[in-house]
Amino acid sequence: WQCALMAPTEILAEQHFRKLIGWLEPLGITTAWLTGNQKAKERREALAMVENGEAQLVVGTHAVIQEKVHFKNLALAVIDEQHRFGVAQRLALRNKLTHDGMEPHMLMMTATPIPRTLAMSYYADLDVSTIDELPPGRTPIITKLVNEARRDEVVERIRAQIAQGRQVYWVCPLIEDSEMLDLSNATQTHSDLSLALQHERRPNGELAQVGLLHSRMPADEKKTVMAAFKEGRMAVLVSTTVIEVGVDVPNASLMVIEHAERFGLSQLHQLRGRVGRGVAASACVLLYSTGDAPRLSESARARLRAMSETNDGFEIARRDLDIRGPGEFLGARQSGDAMLRFADLNHDTALLEWARREAPMLLDRHPALAAKHVARWLGGKSEFLKA
């Protein structure tokens, strides 16, 4: 049998691959690596290993679910940072085992369940395990809401962090200027911060470096920038959301998220989680702007309020569920109205829990009747309940 592990970014997938290689190679277990940036020869060899069963574990990005990938016997599919994938993508991985009516076991992991996932954990066939405590040595992150007008104060705070030998993330919603959106971009912010911090020195006397990271950079350049930041040679990293997952720098103690009102709750929580990984007190600054409007929208205010009030991923998900809705259970939308015909997720919890307990008995004792019931109400869309 084979296992597959799919991660949303190459940075995270490669971290998993290197760690698993170290654990599994001594046991004689072969691990294959699949990503969109592989050279043709390397990719052909990996695909052959997957198809003939030589690769017992396959680690990769979205490349794992492409049509050319054929598993011999997929028994377990692991999806890391599950909230970053769409319903169709998760189904595509599950459908990689198609013979004899069998389906692979699925393990989905996330620090921030999206509305659909949280609702599915309540009402679908999804068992949930929760780790609700910080790892040893971690400190809770303080979250502050700061108006864009106080931007200079945030830069002063960065200077203080640099003087203490700490490192800082600054996240922007765009890579470059957009004619459609009046938002700060990573390229300009990198230029501005480089100028503002050009004379700042770290405790060892070296001038503070300000780096830039975004998805359009060549893979080698991205690796070079990330290595410099991880090794502590770079004090400030200006980035887009490519650092949302898979980046672990214990010395980073300040996260600044620009135009925080434009980000979703799960994304904000994931970005905040890039700091607070060491023993130093850490903070997340949510810079917000109302633009031409007199105030933020109700949903934006609700998101920022949730971030300032809790660090709990499941509580964040519950707030997100209230704000956005659970999405379609029998479709691909992951937020919005549930579109249930009779039930109401908020008011019928007790009845739905009872139905969930009784359903296995009905399926076991009256399979023909249950099949008719499923066909009538689900209309051939039951596959969506598995993702």
Regions found by a protein language model. Give the residues of each.
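C-terminal accessory region of SF2 helicases/translocases
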Residues: 291-387
